[in-house]
């Protein structure tokens, strides 16, 4: 399934070294590698991962 593989379509990084990157994708769940997932109480929920990493995951959508 899509949720099991860590991926991100919209990733923002700072210009620092190492970069601080955050995935801004919003979906019904967060990817499997996400440690800090924040969801709204709406239905369906809108979740995003608030983890900060030094890299971006591969894009979820194959364009």
From Swiss-Prot:
Gene3D superfamilies: Cysteine Protease (Bromelain) Inhibitor, subunit H. GO terms for cellular component: extracellular region. Disulfide bonds join 7-60, 8-23, 11-56, 13-21, 30-37, 34-49, 39-47. Coiled coil: none annotated. CDD domains: BBI. InterPro entries: Bowman-Birk_prot_inh, Prot_inh_BBI. Stable at low pH. The record marks 15-16, 41-42 as: Reactive bond for trypsin. The keyword Disulfide bond applies. One of its GO terms (molecular function) is serine-type endopeptidase inhibitor activity. Thermostable. Monomer. Belongs to the Bowman-Birk serine protease inhibitor family. PANTHER family: BOWMAN-BIRK TYPE BRAN TRYPSIN INHIBITOR (PTHR33479), INHIBITOR, PUTATIVE-RELATED (PTHR33479:SF18). Inhibits trypsin stoichiometrically at the molar ratio of 1:2, with a dissociation constant of 4.2 nM. Does not inhibit chymotrypsin. This is Bowman-Birk type proteinase inhibitor.
